[in-house]
């Protein structure tokens, strides 16, 4: 039977779930270690789901009108997703991003036709959010998607990511591991999975150099895509059972190992989630468990960073 898609939006979601068999063997794991490969979304990251959900919600509620300008503060991937989806729908797109993010992310957004406004990296996402709000005040009829505050962010994962994981594992999942940037992935996916089975453990990953959730301290770090140095409104802190701090070196090492062991090139935050999942899988009490880590994006957008040096 033929299967022909008529828009890139139809390609979002239903990403593959893969067992890391070689990694399991090398580390003598007694647990199954699975990864959700979000780089298979058309925009190359998990944030395609969020972009689509926020735009659909805004259009349905009548707050996003034809010909309007979509503005978004983002560390990169949401900007790429919005640039692709909103641009294809005919909206003007302005992305506000810290200048510390990779050049690949900047070029990708421009490639999709978005306008890019850079803010000082030292101010993190807080600086980008402030600038986006300034732009909204100066551009009539503009819409700030607001992924850090927008319930449609977490809803995307509640409606898609969670159900996909539950179906693909046939309900046999013991732990879910994901990094926290906006908190949408952990909140939406975690809620859905715990509704199916309250015993499922949700592990939140944050930068060790900015342990805001675990220790109340924020600071600069090198884990692009997570650790926004604020507690987003989207994040439900009651969903996760444990916080796993990961260093930049640990994230890099995990991503490099995955490329050379499994042939999968993933990004920095994916390396962080993988490291946390691997450490969980090594615990004696994880024997026989199925652990799933969500890997947000492809490593190709980090080739200008030291990730694969």
What are these regions (language model features)?
Residues 1-309:
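PLP-dependent amino-acid enzyme catalytic core
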């Amino acid at each position: 039977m033929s299967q022909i898609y008529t828009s890139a939006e139809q390609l979002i979601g239903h990403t593959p779930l893969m067992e890391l068999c070689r990694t399991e063997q090398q580390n003598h794991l007694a647990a199954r270690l699975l990864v959700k490969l979000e780089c298979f979304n058309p925009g190359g990251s998990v944030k395609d789901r969020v972009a689509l959900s926020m735009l659909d919600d805004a259009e349905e509620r009548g707050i996003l009108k034809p010909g309007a300008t979509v503005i978004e503060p983002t560390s990169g991937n949401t900007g790429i997703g919005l640039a692709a989806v909103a641009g294809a729908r005919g909206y003007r797109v302005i992305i506000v991003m810290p200048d510390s993010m990779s050049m690949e992310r900047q070029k990708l957004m421009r490639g999709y036709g978005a306008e890019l406004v850079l803010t000082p990296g030292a101010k993190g996402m807080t600086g980008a959010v402030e600038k986006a709000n300034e732009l909204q005040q100066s551009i009539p009829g503009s819409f700030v998607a607001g992924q850090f505050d927008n319930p449609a962010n977490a809803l995307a994962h509640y409606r898609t990511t969670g159900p996909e994981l539950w179906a693909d594992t046939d309900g046999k999942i013991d732990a879910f591991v994901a990094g926290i940037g906006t908190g949408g992935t952990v909140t939406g996916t975690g809620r859905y999975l715990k509704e199916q089975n309250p015993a499922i453990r949700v592990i939140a990953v944050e930068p060790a150099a900015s342990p805001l959730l675990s220790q109340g301290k924020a600071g600069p770090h090198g884990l692009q895509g997570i650790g926004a140095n604020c507690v987003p409104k989207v994040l439900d802190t009651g969903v996760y059972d444990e916080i796993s701090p990961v260093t930049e070196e640990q994230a890099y090492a995990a991503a490099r190992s995955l490329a050379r062991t499994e042939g999968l090139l993933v990004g920095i935050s994916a390396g962080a989630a993988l490291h946390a999942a691997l450490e969980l899988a090594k615990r004696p009490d994880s024997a026989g468990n199925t652990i799933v880590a969500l890997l947000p994006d492809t490593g190709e957008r980090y080739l200008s960073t030291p990730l694969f040096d």
